[in-house]
Amino acid sequence: MENYLMSSPSQHHHPHQQPHQQHNPYANSDTLTNLPNLENDLDFSDSEVVPPSKDYQGSPNVYDGLDFSTDMATDFVYDSTLEFDLDDHKHMPDPAEMGHSKHFSVDRPLSAPFYLSQNSRTNFNHSRNISLDDTAYKRSFHKHSASLVSNAAEPPSGTFAHSHSSNTLQSSSDSMPQLSSSVSNPSLLDSPHSAMQTATPGRRHKSSSVSSHTNLYTTPLRGGTHVSPLTHTKVGKTPIGKTHRRNRSRASLEPSSAHLLATVANMKGTSNASNLALSSAQTPSGHLTASTSQHFHGINLSEANPFHNEFVSPGVGSGHLSDHDATPLNTPAGRDHSSMASQFFTPISHNRSFGGSLLESSSSAMGSAASAFPSNLSSNDLSVASSSNSSARPGMAPLRRNDTLDSITIEDQEDDACKQLRKAKSFTSFAEQRMSQLMKQRAGKSSKDLGNVFTDSTPDASSSGRSPRKDSSSGNSYSKSASVDLLSASLVVPDHNDSYLKSYPASMDLASITNASSGNHASPSPPKTSSRLMPPIESQEPSSSRSRGSSTSKPRQTLASAAAKKLNKKVPQTYPTASQIQKAATTEDIAKFAESILQSENKRPIFVKKQEEEVYDPKKKHKCPLCLARFQRPEHVKRHLKSHSSEKPFQCEEPNCGRRFNRKDNLKAHLKKIHHKNL
């Protein structure tokens, strides 16, 4: 913080101050209100000429020829028509004589102080000052200069991140620790002496400090060794008026450097990084060329990275290999390569056609004479690396463009995905394998047993002779595939004779065979006779028809039993006599209508409900004189009496219909529903 001037010039001794000079009568008054009088007094002091300011190394004033109007920040507002003559030193009075009437803040508009004089900039004395650095600042001499920062102001915290004096431009870069160059405020002295500055990539409207050629002010290594620009980015404070923008790292812009850092990170587990000497040269095109040894002090890079494989994708053969495509993967390093490789799920970990097993011992590869260097090589270098590596590893085979999925073997792998694929592949030919296995088991039996299968007239003897052997064979056949039920031996038909399959009837009930063979695990054998293997179709069909008839007769029997129950509820009764009709009928109309029905030929049999099942309802006061059914109204009884007659006096008159109904309301419902007519 000593780079900034903390005290006013009145507290320091000035070599050009005259002791007999009086203070300015306007020292304690407002400068803005007394500007005309102040200018007249400054013109009176022409006799006291101050010699031109020199720097302390004998050089002339470095402010000569500089245009501050182009380098000021955007918050300075002043009249662009003003001209400042820096060579006019005759109107420069002593600062002690002028005094410090007012100090203008940086945050205020600076248009008013610049109206002091139209010809001289030096008349605006000590109202602002630029801070001095360590080499040029001397406490015994305090020369005034054209300044932009107030003398009594506090050290700038965020407004001016870089304030340089005139000697900063010619001072050595290692005279003082420079500030960071990533601030977004434009420096006051950027041009024309800012040739050494380096712009940050990807930033616009940003200018770095003048003396930022070497970055020694980095916070983690402050004052220490030199920091590589590839690994550390310059971090600065975000200004108030600007938004924060994320800067891209230089390592991401240089693929060869990023590849080099990734290679070093992969080898940290096997050797010390301080003893690692990279034997590679940087070419002008940005690619790394491998050395002849292709080893880093005996460390094989292909063994350090478990995901490293030398086979080339089909797109590499055309010669289009970018820097990012050749960058190896950043994998965690470990000292034991076998244990580290076993921690990763790799589909090609056990396949030698993909580059060999990753669980191999690394001693053979560590001692080999040549191994592939995972760098940004051209297509020719990749072919050389793959050929040299194939001699070191016999199991390594590069994947070419003409290789297909069928040429890749999956039987050597042990992960879950390959197990599922291998199981699905084996299920396609499982039926043929099971059939051949059963044929081999049956081929080893004696001819006597086979003769019993085809020629024995007693099925009991044949089944009893074959059952113990089938128990042993079925136990062996199901030991490996117990979960497969559809391909079991009980459902496989022996392929001994083609005529046997031809004579097999289509109407054979397979459910009976499986149920019969499930108890003793014997092979299905159809019923046998003394003359032929299969029974005749005529004798076989009645059994099947009986089984089918028994299955279909069950629902019919249930329907008949339900109908019988309903009929049992109604007791068949003889037709009532006229006297009984008169007693049962509540009105004469009902009695007459019932007698007419009984006298007609279309009468139906009458079924009367049992009295104990009938529920008494006091609202239903009217009875049917024929079946004793109860109704609430007499018209309901008349409508009901029509159901006792088979006569259908109402007929549909629509063409191609002619249906008849015993009630008129049924005819209306028919016309509305079928013919869509409303009567």
Curated annotation (Swiss-Prot):
- State the InterPro entries in the record: Znf_C2H2_sf, Znf_C2H2_type
What's a single GO BP term from this record? fungal-type cell wall organization
Question: Where does it reside?
Answer: Nucleus; Cytoplasm
> What segments bear the compositional bias annotation Polar residues?
24-37, 208-218, 515-532, 574-584
C2H2-type zinc finger segments: 622-644, 650-675
Gene knockout outcome? Leads to sensitivity to caspofungin.
Does the UniProt entry include the keyword Cytoplasm? yes
Quote the cellular component terms of the Gene Ontology held in the record: cytoplasm; nucleus
**Gene3D superfamilies of this UniProt entry?**
Classic Zinc Finger (3.30.160.60)
A Pfam family per the record: zf-C2H2
Name the source's superkingdom: Eukaryota
- Where does the record place the region Disordered? 1-61, 149-256, 369-408, 435-480, 515-584
**According to its UniProt record, where is this protein mainly located?**
nucleus
> Which keywords are on file for this protein?
Cytoplasm, Metal-binding, Nucleus, Repeat, Transcription, Transcription regulation, Zinc, Zinc-finger
Outcome recorded upon mutating S643D: Impairs translocation to the nucleus in the presence of caspofungin
MF annotations from Gene Ontology: zinc ion binding
Instruction: Point to the regions of Low complexity compositional bias.
Output: 163-192, 369-392, 543-565
Annotated function: Transcription factor involved in the cell wall damage response. Required for expression of numerous cell wall biosynthesis inhibitor caspofungin-responsive genes. Plays a key role in adherence, hyphal development, and virulence.
* Protein name in UniProt: Cell wall integrity transcriptional regulator CAS5
What is the native source organism of this protein?
Answer: Candidozyma auris (Yeast)
Q: Which gene encodes it?
A: CAS5
